[in-house]
Design a protein with these regions (language model features):
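A helix-coil-helix interface module used to build multimeric assemblies
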Residues: 1-154
Length: 154
């Protein structure tokens, strides 16, 4: 279940928003867009993310409906986001390509998935260590070149 959540549209859209909003922060720091606009994007985005969390299926369907018209996933998302952000949404995605957003999001998702896998590996290693210590002195048949050899222990 945890791994599946990483690959849901809701998580993908949440990461898209964060990528877009952080890009706006950077552009505001450089004086490319007003700092107030970056704040408005975060504020409106927080409302959008709350709506996405409260009614994921309905909000994803809204984005999907826009995409069926625009034939463009990121444009559909930014259009949906604009309903929550308002006039300052014109600064969202400015200076970015869709690949900037998609590739960064994919990297974040891979990191999230890797973290889960590493957590699982730690549990497997702990279980293996426990079993190895438990059977440290358990006798077994040794093998050499695929045939039985002298007895040994695990």
């Amino acid at each position: 279940p945890q791994m599946a959540v990483i690959w849901t549209p809701e998580n993908r859209f949440r990461i898209w928003f964060e990528v877009e909003a952080h890009a706006c922060d950077a552009m505001a720091e450089l004086g490319i867009i007003p700092k107030a606009a970056a704040k408005a994007i975060w504020d409106g985005g927080a409302k959008a993310m709350a709506a996405l969390k409260a009614s994921p299926a309905a909000e994803v369907e809204k984005i999907d409906a826009i995409e069926r018209v625009t034939k463009h996933d990121v444009l559909a998302f930014t259009t949906w986001l604009a309903d929550y952000v308002g006039p300052d949404s014109r600064f969202v995605h400015q200076g970015l390509t869709s690949s900037d957003v998609l590739d960064t999001t994919f990297a974040v998702q891979l990191t999230q998935a890797s973290d889960l896998l590493l957590e699982g590996i730690d549990k497997v290693l702990a279980a293996l260590k426990k079993r190895a210590l438990e059977h440290k002195h358990t006798p077994t048949i040794g093998r050499s070149h695929g045939i039985h050899a002298e007895p040994t222990t695990f």
